[in-house]
């Protein structure tokens, strides 16, 4: 209990007092490429998904309430998303072992990518950082089949986000 309060206090402090720097990502720009490992230690490059839509969502921490809600909603909507020629990639600074437990516990059918050094989150301006403490922000980027940012979300409601993503993908593909 004590450690949970300390961790929650630290997370609140990071969110309250850290700055994100410049707003570096803009719609229409090329999405920064990366190579990260998933929960099965399989490498994924963004460029491997050229020709498909990509829902790249950053989240703070495996198996926490909001992150679990968001991931499970993407799980429940995965067939509708894939019918739209899109793939879901989740990213946090958690390690691959944590991702494997989280994915296994909730039956997540998409890659959870480990950004342990937070370089990818930083390149997408999706990082809270306070010294050695780093946490991914809850941001989502829709990347078109040409590898460009089609839309991004800085304020995400985990309860309805996957439904919103489906509606936007349908609109973008008209």
Positions of PLM-derived features:
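Short, acidic, Ser/Thr-enriched surface-loop or helix-capping motifs
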Residues: 25, 38-39, 143-144
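N-proximal helix/coil linker or "cap" segments that precede and/or mark the start of modular domains
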Residues: 3-33
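Short active-site neighborhood of thiol/selenol oxidoreductases, capturing the structured segment around
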Residues: 47-68
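Short loop/turn microsegments at loop-to-beta-strand junctions
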Residues: 31-32, 53, 137-139
